[in-house]
Amino acid sequence: MEYTKKIVYQSNYWYNDGLRKAKIRDMSGAIMSLRKSLQFNRENIAARNLLGLVYYGIGEVPEALVEWIISKNLKSRDNIADYYIKNV
């Protein structure tokens, strides 16, 4: 159980780092942090959706769609990725 908590903590740490970088428009830094977050927990829906938004923000629409579709497959209900996919 302790190991699982550490993995989730690390994933959340890198998600928050990516969020901070995205807010200041450091998109390449945000991408690196969010990818690292997903290395620790590939089911981190918030990190995956934010990564999609960052990709979309830099004009990488196909990459954004990939992340949102994966997110939608991991959590089919109440997922903001559904909105993003419909509005691309």
Regions found by a protein language model. Name each.
Residues 1-13:
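TPR-adjacent "capping" and linker segments in tetratricopeptide-repeat scaffold/adaptor proteins
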Residues 5, 35-39, 70-73:
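Conserved structural position within tetratricopeptide repeats
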